[in-house]
């Protein structure tokens, strides 16, 4: 009471002011009066401050007096009506909300009034034009009215058939809320309040399916419209709330228990003679499907005819909005939809029997079954699976990955409930056929662009460190990686089902055996499927599961694994040989790429499954794996790396080199047989990969193969591509040989320095002052004894000169390039015997001989018209000379024999050849020392007369306008020219180191002048004192 008193005192003045306007005569009353609006706002503001159920009904009676007077006026403005509705809402909230405070009579009087104030016309046309604030006020008052009625004891009978006078207002209120829900897509709060009002009305007040059945169609229609709208128009939370309200409405109307439904199934054709059944059979039902009968008294609205008609409408509505909701791919919507469907399958299983398919299909597509309802609907689930299987080709072609995942989910449910006897075999058949249809036929692939051979740097570089993991994904032709991954997971799951049923062996054997005369594409698909089936065996049983295995099961499993793996391996071997023969000399097509990747994937999987038992089988497949490592296809290389790592991890403790070395004999045999059969393509790349992976040790096992390659160079030296591949291989061999026998370049220089004079003051091979004294002593002794002809000559070495001139002349008489080819071959053959006692090179004589052979064939092919081949040969020669310098006696012979051929390349007009040729000559000068001093002097003369590259520079140091800055480059050269000039300058400067005291100052000045136009002056002037003086002279005197 105290609250009422305080509230009365607080609101009395506002009510008085409102009454003054409300009780005005009709002719004086202004329905749109702003004063009236202000008074209503004051009252509403006062009421909004009071807590729920804090005041008595008497207080409401007092406040309602001016409101009742207002309602007697002929009209009321929109804003004024809005605040009247808000005032009624507050009165319901504060005074009429709890049990016993809101009389049934008052409710019956107030409800029609509220619905009229919200919408005065039955069609709600005016309501559409109202503001959202007005609509919200209407929803608020209706929601609060329903809540207040719910709190009263009479709430169950408030809208009963015994009180028909309220039914029109009830129908009107429902249409108002549905109209607001449908027409306010941008106002979520308004929609939530409308849905909350309907929920209270349906579930807590009416809760009578019979009565709700009258208003069901309109509700379902509006709800379906809401749920079918796109996401940009309807918030996902509104969809979730709508599904909740719709589920409650459908359960109230179609609940199997309340309808007292009895389900009969036809078991005998004679049952059709039953009169009742004749009447109930409807064409929309399957002939052998369930026929629903209702026990009715003839007075109820919900009879069989009603059920047949309305359930069909419900099915149409479900088929309309469920696919739209699925496409939104929203987690909250998916969860609400799964709950919605599960509730209908639980409470309305029989009454909405015709909706069973769409409901089951929804759970399958959602891959959710929160109430575990699918096991009780296996027949319909199987129909859904069969339909998806028949559409599997389209699912794959259009890359509907989600549909494939849901199919796997459905098959799992069937498998868990012993409904897989024929289903799993049907799945395998459809999967095989669908993949074949989805992958492009070979006739269309043949005209596709072939995979272009990449540079040797790419195709022969195998980087296992960058491989994130094994089990590389094989993308199916014409399908994305995502879809390929989904298919792989799907197939793997089917394999696990086959394994559980112990029929994996039979299915794989049958699948492969049927492909004997099939096109290669089908064979590859069969192999891809079989391998993914077998991959299920790779999963090891958990430790606790091992104890549950019976011995017979374990033995069967072991024998089954080995048998099916061997079948797949044999199939891989046949396919691999066919592919190798087909692509030899033709290049790899995209279809070949997928085929090779699948074979490698199969080998990797079998290795993972068989583990140590795969060791005896490896010899037949190691060449296939290594061959793929050298493939021009990046995809094939990636998969082969994954396969090689798997084999190494399983059998060789993760060591790729050990894997290669342990099987090198089989690799030699495979490569030799291919060479002998004329299959020369890519042999060099394979050897490169082997050498890179396992080091030079493998080449020692490939000596016969290397000899065969040398013979092929004799026979096929006109084929530039083949020769180029061989010299790319030679480069790898040389690098690996250096890696094994030579620690670093300093080691080579240390060995070479024993024979090379590095001091400019000892050009005749003398390295210290004592050698000078010894020479002088011997010459003096000869002069003292020259008159005594009977004296015995002084003891000296036969090979040691008696004076400077003889020593210098002996150097010039050493072997040079006039030696013919036959002498070279004899020297190569006899080198190991002749120098056995004095062999100083860390490189064994057999390996050294390989270097000499490579050098000899390279010199011969330097006249080949192919520019790429000549460049590659020069690159290889540049690598050879430092290694040859470790045995100086043989180095000088090779320098002498190859000098002229390489100099011809230096004088070439093609600068891309000049650059490696100059680098090669630089190495020859560096490691031969004063042996090539005379040749270098002659070379400079040739350069001045015949060189094209030297013409890019100014040779005469006296013509530069006496400007220091003119010494630098007078033109900006293209990259090719620039590289060639730099290489030539380095070559010339290396020659200057051994000839600066043998050539005239004018020539030396000419050489230095050319060099400082290309490389920094500081680098040249720091070479020696003489060179520094020449640089100073050029810059300051000329």
From Swiss-Prot:
Family (UniProt): Belongs to the tti1 family.
One BP annotation, GO: chromatin organization
Acidic residues composition bias: residue spans: 816-829
Name listed for the protein in its UniProt record: TEL2-interacting protein 1
Superkingdom classification of source: Eukaryota
Gene responsible for this protein: TTI1
Alphabetized SUPFAM superfamilies for the sequence: ARM repeat
A Pfam family annotated for this UniProt entry: TPR_TTI1_C
